[in-house]
Curated annotation (Swiss-Prot):
Expressed in seeds (at protein level). Expressed in flowers but not in leaves, stem or roots. GO terms for biological process: defense response to fungus; killing of cells of another organism. InterPro entries: Vicilin_N. It comes from the Eukaryota. Keywords: Antimicrobial, Disulfide bond, Fungicide, Plant defense, Secreted, Signal. The gene is sm-amp-x. It comes from Stellaria media. Eleven additional peptides containing a similar cysteine pattern are predicted from this sequence. However, there is only tentative evidence. This is Antimicrobial peptide X precursor. One of its GO terms (cellular component) is extracellular region. It is found in: Secreted.
Length: 478
């Protein structure tokens, strides 16, 4: 009986200690749950949230699994549970309850100084190198002066300082936002999320893929936003790609720019007319037609008139018609009336040939059959006028304008008299060099001179032409 009180005492002590342990474990589990809840409701980045949860398990007990890892901002692989002293120090800085990002950075800097971890690619982002310091100054300036465009501004800072460490992903974007002051941190993070969502599922043009290789999706998005790759420009680009095949991107760019100006300058009626007239032909036909039909009243009237006259005869007929009509005021009225009378019932081509004086003896005899000697003399006189042309007109112009009449010779002569010194004085050096290169294959010094002169006056637009005859055709259009 004497041992019974002792047994009861031991049993009560055992039960009390067991209950105390159970209560203690329940308290720790409750505290662990509260700690994890605090981590979940805070606006931490994914890696900081994992660090916070990991600290909860260390402080209040729990499993140690790969679920709770610390990911360094710059590490390519996550750090598992085993932490070095430097990483442990840094982890405590990040899981600090104060929530101050600036204080966390100061804490991490002290960790780096204390443990001297030189292998970490991490946080001392405020690095010892001058380049890094300049980048940080640039970044801080972005945050102060360009809060709405700070991502784009930071990209420029990175480019200027050669900052090329990894893709500029959402995590990096979010991390940059952590240093934002004056309550705009959440707005900055929202922009990061929006940047990421906007990019999802959107096709990226090959040009932007190549340009942003290794740069991440924000670079691609900015490239796509600033490119000319909308629906209309893609259509133009396909046409220009075909027209500029083998001539490089500069040709395409100029082609697209010229097309854009054509679209803005041309009347809808003229545009439809050119599309109809050039149906089934190359895009160059439509572009030339649009250029011919200037957006002034006279140009439209001439174009519509020539369209009627040249129905079924193609674009070359209309081009010649417009050229002749434009030079009608300079032609001898007597010749014009004679040609109209002589070619009555024979169509526009006959009248055109007559106005240009491109007939030989046999042609004159045929055209003037039954119309008297005056007709034949007038026809022959026009024929001789081309042969007895002004001696001041170069042989090169006579050769180019053979069969084209006096209007062509006069324009060619004017082009020859262009003062190269005055022309080159106002010409961009790149355009001048380009024109010299483009006209290098033109035979003859005078021909090359005219080619360069026309090219420079056209500000290099002559790049789409390849022969001297096309150069002069462009000259005649002036």
């Amino acid at each position: 009986m004497g041992k019974l009180p002792l047994l009861l005492l031991l049993l009560s002590v055992f039960l009390t200690s067991t209950l105390a342990l159970r209560l203690s474990n329940e308290d720790r589990q409750q505290e662990l749950g509260q700690c994890l809840h605090r981590c979940d409701i805070r606006r931490y980045s994914p890696d900081m949230q994992r660090a916070c949860r990991h600290k909860c398990h260390m402080d209040f007990g729990g499993r140690k699994s790969d679920e709770f890892v610390v990911v360094d901002y710059h590490y390519e692989e996550p750090e598992l549970f085993s932490l070095s002293p430097y990483q442990m120090c840094k982890f405590h800085c990040r899981a600090d309850d104060s929530g101050s990002f600036g204080r966390m950075l100061e804490c991490e800097k002290k960790c780096a100084e204390e443990y001297g971890n030189e292998n970490s690619r991490n946080v001392d982002e405020r690095s010892p190198s001058d380049s890094r310091k300049r980048f940080e100054e640039c970044r801080r300036k972005c945050q102060k002066t360009h809060p709405d465009k700070q991502l784009e501004c930071i990209r420029k800072c990175q480019k200027a300082q050669g900052e090329r460490k990894g893709d500029y992903t959402f995590e990096v974007c979010e991390r940059r936002c952590q240093d934002t002051r004056h309550g705009s941190k959440l707005a900055c993070i929202d922009r990061c999320v929006k940047e990421g969502r906007d990019n999802e599922g959107r096709p990226v043009s090959p040009k932007c893929q190549k340009k942003c290789e290794g740069e991440g999706y924000i670079c691609q998005r900015m490239c796509m936003k600033g490119s000319d790759d909308d629906t209309q420009d893609r259509q133009v680009s396909l046409k220009c790609q075909k027209m500029c095949e083998g001539k490089g991107y500069d040709c395409q760019k100029r082609c697209m720019r010229m097309d854009q100006s054509d679209d803005n300058d041309q009347d809808t009626q003229v545009s439809k007319m050119c599309q109809k007239m050039c149906q089934g032909k190359s895009y160059e036909c439509q572009r030339k037609c649009m250029k011919e039909c200037d957006d002034d009243t006279q140009g439209r009237q001439v174009s519509l008139k020539c369209q009627r006259m040249c129905r079924g005869e193609g674009y070359d007929c209309q081009k010649k018609c417009m050229r002749i009509d434009q030079s009608d005021d300079n032609e001898d009225p007597q010749i014009s009336k004679m040609c109209q009378k002589m070619c009555q019932g024979k169509g526009y081509v006959c009248e055109s040939m007559c106005m240009k004086g491109g007939h030989d003896d046999t042609q004159c005899q045929k055209m003037c059959q039954g119309k008297g000697d005056d007709c034949q003399k007038m026809c022959m006189g026009m024929d001789q006028s081309d042969k007895n042309e002004d001696p001041q007109v170069s042989q090169m112009c006579q050769q180019i304008c053979q069969g084209e009449g006096r209007g062509c010779l006069q324009r060619c002569k004017r082009a020859e008299k262009v003062d190269d010194a005055n022309t080159e004085m106002n010409v961009d050096p790149d355009v001048r060099a380009y024109c010299k290169h483009q006209c290098m294959s033109t035979r003859g010094d005078q021909a090359r001179k005219i080619c360069e002169s026309v090219c420079m006056r056209q500000d290099g637009k002559i790049m789409l032409l390849s022969t001297i005859s096309e150069v002069v055709a462009r000259l005649l259009d002036d």
